[in-house]
Amino acid sequence: MAGGAFVLGSTGMCGLQMLKAVEKSASFDKVVTIGRRPPSLESPKLKAIVEKDSEKWGEIVEKEAKGFKVLMSGLSTTRGAAGSDEGFYNIDYTLNYAAAKAAKNAGVETYVLISGSFADANSRFLYIKTKGKLEDDVRALKFKRTIIFRPGLILGDREKKKSAGEEFIVSILKYTYGNFLSNITNPIYAKHIGEIATTLASEPIPEDQTEPTVRIIGARELSALGKALP
């Protein structure tokens, strides 16, 4: 299946790793991304669109994703980085949903979303509630195939550095990878998330499939898949 893929969040930890995995994959001959700044990856296969006005992203996705079969999103932030509840919601929900809806209108068949553990639209916690609402609304778009990752602890390097406190906590949690504590933290490297997402997205949809499918991969399953990779 040589074709194109659209990747969102390509300057973030998971999005960048998905972008790298798609770029390396023989299943895709073109990859397009959009952001307020360009990703660190350069490739003849890559078209990186820089648009600081995120309200235009949906329109751009709908135009650029025509003829593509896949859209993958690692677009996400934190309440602290966004500066407010509204800022967080705008990125994690509004931008993601607008792009998903645009992709559906463009004819995209497979949608891959990096969500979060315990995503639940009925939660009273902003992060969990927002992730859950996005999952619910994306599923309602009825792509032929929707794949949702709910990772636990994500390991890897970020372009935007964490605070000293966050770095300390992550440095401690890294030691849970591969030992008995991994059953609690369910760690996975962002690189492996990118590889798994790309592999699943490149699998052909059965010709006799008549109904939309949704696969949710929880933290424990995702961690196991990551550890099985070289």
Curated annotation (Swiss-Prot):
Example GO biological process: import into nucleus
Family listed: Belongs to the FMP52 family.
Coiled coil: none
Targeting presequence: 1-45
Compartments, as annotated in UniProt: Mitochondrion outer membrane
Protein name: Protein FMP52-3, mitochondrial
SUPFAM superfamilies xref list: NAD(P)-binding Rossmann-fold domains (SSF51735)
Superkingdom of origin: Eukaryota
